[in-house]
Amino acid sequence: MMPYNTPPNIQEPMNFASSNPFGIIPDALSFQNFKYDRLQQQQQQQQQQQQNRTASSLQQPQQQQPISPPLFLVGAGTSENSNLNKNANTSTIPPLLFSRSSQHYVVPDIDHSSIIYKNNICKSFKDDLFFCPRSLLSLEEQQACEKMDRLTAEQMSLYHQNTQSSSNPGSMSSSPPNSASSIFNSRPKFNPYTSQSFNPLESVQE
């Protein structure tokens, strides 16, 4: 029978030459170098993690700061910003700008009086629902519109005479201005619901 191979004692030094059939003795220095390289890699990884944390902590307050809008949209009450608003409106009207602040959007100031002036909107149709061309009106309604045109022309002539008389106090106008204003205020307005041209029953009966 073969004898039982007992394991070597841990406390006793191992004889590598006798146990190793190839006669290779492990190098203790290579094992120490492996440990040293491993420690260096761990230290480098820790340093990189700390640098990344510091960089992220510095970038967070910069990202929280809101982006300031352009000068021509901030403080419309000041004189400089109002001049910038006028220049911006004459050239090109900027779109609605959404900001991160409490105000959801900023609308630039637009002078609507110039648009109304250019369109030359008639005063008699300001309060109506929609504008009806005279070609769709009946003969009686066209005659009424002609009378209204004459009254407005008379009123404008009286207004020009009054302005000239106020500029020249020597020449006084003979016609009273109150009569034209009373006629202008008492004129009837066009009602599409009572007009004969908007009667659908006539087309149905035919």
UniProtKB/Swiss-Prot annotation:
The modification Phosphoserine is found at S68. Residues 78-88, 192-206 have a biased composition (Polar residues). Residues 40-73, 165-186 have a biased composition (Low complexity). One of its GO terms (cellular component) is cytoplasm. Residues 38-88, 160-206 are annotated as: Disordered. Present with 922 molecules/cell in log phase SD medium. This is Uncharacterized protein YPL229W. It comes from Saccharomyces cerevisiae (strain ATCC 204508 / S288c) (Baker's yeast).
